[in-house]
């Protein structure tokens, strides 16, 4: 097994028995996870591999937050403490955490009814409301670092990035269908940005504590009920309504790059009610996330700059969405605010 964790040392520290099976869980892009069965039970073993989030003290702070959320009834899977009373084990310079195994499956928006979509929005709204209760006041906290900065993208920087990516596409040999689609979308996006550059949003508004990475692979369902929100590595202070919009876009995008707007509407109504978020906050967030998508090329950067193709399968729908959203801007905004 590649990148095999030090099971003997970890299981002794946790008093979790002897390993029977240990299988990689392959959905994560930034960390490594394992389904671990031992003589004492079933667990999820997480190797905190991403250097941006792997500091043991920071991991333990997030662990304490999830335990407080669990105490408020939020469906999470707090980690287990080991024999030294901590929830992070550092072995060989690497940080690990052991969680109870949660039986469940991931579900995308196409598998949810409108009622279940509303329940999803209410869940995220409750998460935001509960985080305000269990986390320190925002005024004493620096905004989280990560892929969603408060300052909106500068189109001048995006034009330069498009030119650089087009250079990568031209140099890739042999050219393939992905290169052809990438070139088409880059040229298309450049034209859209030239047309809409004056619509760049101002700096973000109201911030709050957010999960930071709320999407289908970080939510487990048992039957029709959310069983656990996982992967709190990006917990931090960000514009909270932007997380709500961003999550809706990920959950409810269709394979052709359109959004299921009736489900978005049900989700957004429930979110606003649970989080106490006004419609104006959602409207501003929708505009900022639209602009973010118009300027975002992380999947192409992974492909061409890192040689990492794990996100390639997401690119056709994600790249088509930016174009469709621009064309249907008013309808999308209306779905988030009414």
Where do the protein language model's features map onto the residues?
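Juxta-kinase regulatory segment immediately upstream of eukaryotic protein kinase catalytic domains
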Residues: 1-21
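Protein kinase glycine-rich loop
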Residues: 22-27
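Active-site acidic catalytic loop and adjacent metal/ATP-binding pocket
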Residues: 29-38, 44-45, 79, 191-242
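ATP-binding pocket architecture of kinase catalytic cores
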Residues: 38-141
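A glycine-centered beta->alpha junction motif in the catalytic cores
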Residues: 96-110, 164-175, 247, 291-311
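A cross-family kinase active-site recognition segment
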Residues: 110-183, 207
């Amino acid at each position: 097994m590649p990148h095999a964790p030090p099971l003997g040392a970890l299981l002794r520290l946790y008093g979790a028995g002897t390993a029977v099976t240990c299988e990689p869980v392959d959905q994560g892009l930034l960390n490594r996870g394992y389904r671990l069965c031992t003589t004492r039970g079933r667990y999820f073993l997480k190797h905190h591999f991403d250097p941006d989030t792997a500091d043991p003290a920071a991991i333990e702070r997030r662990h304490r937050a999830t335990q407080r959320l669990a105490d408020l009834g939020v469906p999470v899977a707090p980690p287990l403490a080991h024999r030294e009373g901590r929830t992070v084990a550092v072995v060989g310079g690497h940080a690990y955490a052991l969680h109870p195994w949660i039986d469940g499956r991931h579900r995308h928006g196409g598998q949810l009814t409108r009622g279940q979509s509303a329940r999803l929005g209410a869940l995220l709204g409750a998460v935001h409301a509960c985080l305000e209760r269990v986390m320190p006041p925002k005024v004493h906290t620096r905004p989280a670092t990560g892929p969603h900065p408060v300052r909106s993208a500068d189109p001048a920087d995006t034009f330069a990035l498009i030119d650089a990516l087009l250079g990568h596409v031209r140099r890739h040999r042999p050219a393939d269908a992905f290169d052809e689609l990438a070139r088409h979308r880059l040229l298309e996006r450049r034209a859209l940005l030239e047309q809409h550059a004056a619509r760049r949003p101002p700096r973000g508004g109201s911030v709050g504590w957010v999960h930071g990475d709320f999407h289908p692979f970080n939510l487990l369902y048992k039957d029709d009920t959310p069983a656990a929100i996982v992967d709190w590595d990006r917990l931090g202070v960000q514009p909270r309504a932007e997380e709500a919009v961003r999550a809706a876009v990920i959950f409810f995008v269709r394979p052709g790059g359109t959004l299921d707007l009736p489900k978005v509407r049900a989700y957004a109504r429930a979110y606003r009610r649970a989080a106490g978020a006004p419609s104006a906050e959602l409207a501003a967030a929708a505009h900022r996330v639209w602009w973010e998508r118009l300027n975002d090329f992380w999947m192409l950067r992974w492909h061409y700059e890192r040689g990492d193709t794990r996100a390639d399968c997401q690119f056709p729908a994600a790249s088509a969405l930016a174009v469709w959203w621009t064309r249907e801007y008013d309808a999308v905004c209306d779905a988030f605010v009414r």
